[in-house]
Amino acid sequence: IGNVTQDIYNFSPQQSYAYIDQSKDAEGFWTEYINTKLSYNFNNFIIELGKFNRHWGNGVRSLYFSNKAPSYPQIGFKYKLNQKLSYLYLHGFLNSNIPDSSRSSYYKNDFSLRSISIPRNIAAHRIEWKLNDKFIFSFNESVIYATRSLDIYYLIPILPFYPIENYIGDTDNIQMGFDILFRINELQKAYVSFFMDEFTPEWIFKSKNHNWFGWQFGYNIKDAILKNSEFQIEYNWTDQRIYMHKYDINDFYNHQHPLGFWAGPHAQELLYNYITYFGDRILKFHFSKTKRGLNTREMVEDNYRDMQLKRYEQGYEERTLVSISFKTPSNIKDLRYSI
C-alpha cells in the first residue's frame, strides 16, 4: 500500500526508510530511496530546491534538522546580508502517515486500495550572526502545520511564525532554538545547541510551564594525541515532551521519524569520535551510549494536563555502539571503501 509502519532503524541514527513494501512476485520487501538537490548561487543569494535532508547546528547530531527522517521535498534560500549576518528560509512538505479518509475513498475498489495521508508541512527560518572570530550565534524558528497543502502566511519569510500562528487560530506547532559556536583557539572549539517546543511566555518561570527543551553540548580538539587527528565529545538530551504535539497531526516528524535528534524525545546520548588522518587514509574510532524512555500518545496527552511522570519511570531501552573504521582510496578513481 505504501504507508507501511516499520521499525527498522527505529533505535539507530541510520536514516530510516519512508516505507517498506512486500514484494508482489517474490519473498522479501522493497523500498525506494532518492535524494536530489538543485542550488543556484547569485553571489550572496543561494536558492535551493529538491528532496533532501538538512543539518542545522555544529554537532555530530542535530536537535533541529538531521538526516534521521526520510528526506522530503523542499524549497529554500540563503541570503548573506554581509560578512556577519546570513538569513535562511525553507518550506518543506512532510508525510504525516495519518490517513485522510475523505480522499482515500476515491482510491479504492474491489481489487485495489491506496492510502492518502493528511498533508503536513514545515516552514523554518534561521539567522546566523558571526559576532567575531570567536563566536557565531544562530537563532532558529519553525512551524509544523497540517490539513492544508500550503499556507500563504508561512510563505512570507520575514514574518516571525509565533505571532502568525496565534493570529490564524493557534492550531499549529511552533519550535524555537539557538546554536552557539565558540572557537577557543585554532585547534579547539566548543558548542551549545538549544531546542524549545511549545513556547508559552507567561509560564516561563512557573514549574508547570509547557516550555519543553532539548540540549546539546560538545567539544572538539584537533591534533590531540597524534598530529592530523581530531577528538570530539558530545552530549545530547531531549525532554520527554518535545517533538510530539497535543494534536498528532502536528508532530515534528516525517514518515513517523523525528526531524531532529535521531532518538527522538525522552532520550539522551553521549558520544566520542577520534579520527586520525594518514594522508588520504582515515582511521576512525566511534563510541555512542544512548538511553531512551517510553513515549506514547497517552503520555503526550498527560503532559498537556501537567500529569507527566518522572523521567524513565515507565522503563527505557539502551544502546551502546563501539566501532572502528578504516577508509582508504581504491585503485579505481574516486572510489573508496571502508572496513
Can you say where each PLM-predicted feature lies in the sequence?
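Outer-membrane beta-barrel channel domains
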Residues: 1-136, 143, 147, 208-210, ...
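Exposed, low-structure sequence patches enriched in small/polar residues
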Residues: 31, 130-339
